[in-house]
Amino acid sequence: MKNFFKKAFLALCIISIASCSDDDDTIFIPDSMTIADFVSDNADYSSLLAALQRTGLDVALNGNGTFTVFAPNNAAFTEFLDGASLDDVPDATLEQILRNHVLGTTETAADLTTGYVKNIATETNSGANISMYINTTNGVVINGESTVTTPDIMTDNGVIHAVDKVIPLPTMLTFVGLDSNFSTLATVATTTTGFNTDFETVLSAEDSNLTLLAPDNDAFADLGDISGVSAAALEQILLNHVLAGTNVSTALTTTYSNTLATYGDTMNNLSIYINTDSGVSFNGISDVSEADIVASNGVIHKVDAVITLPTVVTFATADANFSTLVSALTDLTPMTDFAAILSRTEGGNLDLINPAFTVFAPTNAAFDALTSIPDESGLTPILLHHVIGAANVRSGDLSDGLVTPGTLEGDALTVSIPGTNGAIANLTDGAGNDDIEIVAVDVQASNGVIHVINKVMVPNPLD
């Protein structure tokens, strides 16, 4: 008899839902009715029930909690399966698809606003919860796929919003295409002709496992007119916003990483400097404005500036470990515009100082070890002694006994491998000092490469 009244009351609620024309009306289910009960007792959700039971999620949705479920009916499942059977969907995939319809908090229709929320599905590589893009401009639309048809079916462990389509797991391309803040990025990445990279495929492939640093529309506007930028250069700029691996914000640390952009015609990936001292910034020019937009195949961090291709100067100025070097190259040597010289990306310069540049960059500690820093007339040749022109000499090019091409000062350097104290290699400078240790290598810029050294090198004093 109790079940009879329970089902009769439920039927009355369903009739009320079907006849309701005001989307703001809230439908209340008896306090004893859980989300799982509602699905179980409503024949139009039998496909959803079967999926929940198969994955064990019916148990979770029958217990205590504060859930929001976007519930597809049978017609939505039929359309999604497109002639296949629910049994054809692998268990793990089905569970993630179902989780993609569930929020861990109770959100009524009035609580939902245009933007991102997290559901309880997870991205495979990072374990982070997947994002969901809600658009409330005209009703409630989820990930551009599924529209809420009946909102606010209240239960004792959350709320159900009936939706007209199953919500597939989103890819990075899903969010770039849907979020109006990324409309310029979407246009540039998917409509520019002449690219060798198919960005649509890169951002939509199930196994991408990438991090996209996505400039918003304002970032592109600040960059200025890009109509004159070649397709090859523009492609590299876009690739400079993509990192291998799904790197959520909590996994980022202050360090160098690599992007998918490459140096010249080589396969050497460009470096990117990540600084997490105050928020997250890249190459000292672009800050994360919204982190962790997690897709099924990677993560997006929205950034406020386009990350242009770095020069060796970019890294020197971005990395605080080189602040004394930067001061030496600028404030202490005003007669030589080192910043402009080392920012060059084209050859054929009248002074014969041409990229690529190989820079052996002393740390702040290296400068601190000096008794004093010479005046400009003495400092300029010292700085020139740290740069090789017209050569991108990477660590793989170094060998024991190698004598490098002459530095911009004139003297060559001699390489010793292995280095002392665990260093990658040692250098002997023009003055014969053989204890200069290379402690980090291959910070690859678009116009050269930086290797970090622990001492300031000195040219031959007799030159």
Outline where the language-model segments fall.
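Mature, structured domains of secreted/extracytosolic soluble proteins
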Residues: 4-7, 20-463
